[in-house]
């Protein structure tokens, strides 16, 4: 049962505030009339060392491409991100200077965090949980089965093959901010027609009968670069990515949005139908 939940941006008024959520944590503690010493587990939403492994292996696999991106990412990781537990302890002491129980701090795999947030508040004792996003540590799409108080991941699709990153690539192409403006791309879709759907299927993503997929990395930069797409992607659609400061949204962009929206929905439906057939679980 969820007792309290809050987003830091609601307190700071900073959209997508990525700082330690001091105000949100303090709110849920106050709301539930608890102190840190009363809490059994404090869980961080991903495993930093696994994510760091993915970054290193990706840069090695794509080398010498991506050196600029690599050189920008490494100082941040070596200075801060590899020491999340220490950082969390320091921040938690702002709520209670006497708190020192590091054993209470746990790290959950990113997609397991998503699955738990969907399954445990649900009315189901058993369900299939399908998670699809940009990328967690390695996983971009996972299938899990939840039974009562247990969760088990059954299948994974790994980076760089990602439906979320494909959608973000089109977010970038149409001139919206990645990891922020995806909802704008979705909102644009009903105003267009999916005339580029087959071009996406034929060039960018190979979808298997069970809904699993591979992305053609010849068209993307996100694995190691500083942008989502490359010139080959732009050439495929006959336009460069829209500059939101100089270019208005045209019917072309609406049709692009409609096309990637249909592709995304079709792949998700294909995945769900395949999983329903394989696992014989009615709840999703």
Say what each PLM segment does.
Residues 1-284:
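Short acidic/glycine-rich loops and adjacent helix/strand connectors
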């Amino acid at each position: 049962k969820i007792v309290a939940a809050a987003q830091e941006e609601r307190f700071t008024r900073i959209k997508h505030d990525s700082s330690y959520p001091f105000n949100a944590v303090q709110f849920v503690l106050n709301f539930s009339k608890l102190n840190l010493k009363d809490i059994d587990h404090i869980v961080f939403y991903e495993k930093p060392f696994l994510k760091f492994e993915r970054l290193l292996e990706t840069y090695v696999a794509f080398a010498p491409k991506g050196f600029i991106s690599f050189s920008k990412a490494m100082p941040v990781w070596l200075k801060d991100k590899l020491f999340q537990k220490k950082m969390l302890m320091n921040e938690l002491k702002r709520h209670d200077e006497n708190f020192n129980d590091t054993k209470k701090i746990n790290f959950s795999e990113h997609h397991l965090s998503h699955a738990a947030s969907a399954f445990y508040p649900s009315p189901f004792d058993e369900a299939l949980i399908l998670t699809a996003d940009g990328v967690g540590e390695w996983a971009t799409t996972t299938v899990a089965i939840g039974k009562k108080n247990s969760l088990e991941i059954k299948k994974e699709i790994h980076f760089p093959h990602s439906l979320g990153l494909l959608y973000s690539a089109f977010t970038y192409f149409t001139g919206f901010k990645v990891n922020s403006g995806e909802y704008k791309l979705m909102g644009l879709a009903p105003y267009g027609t999916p005339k580029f759907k087959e071009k996406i299927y034929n060039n960018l993503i190979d979808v298997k009968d069970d809904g699993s997929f591979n992305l053609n990395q010849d068209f993307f930069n996100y694995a190691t670069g500083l942008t989502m797409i490359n010139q080959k992607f732009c050439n495929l659609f006959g336009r460069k990515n829209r500059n939101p400061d100089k270019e208005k949204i045209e019917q072309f962009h609406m049709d692009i949005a409609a096309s990637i929206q249909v592709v995304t929905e079709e792949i998700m439906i294909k995945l769900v139908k395949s999983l329903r057939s394989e696992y014989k679980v009615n709840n999703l």
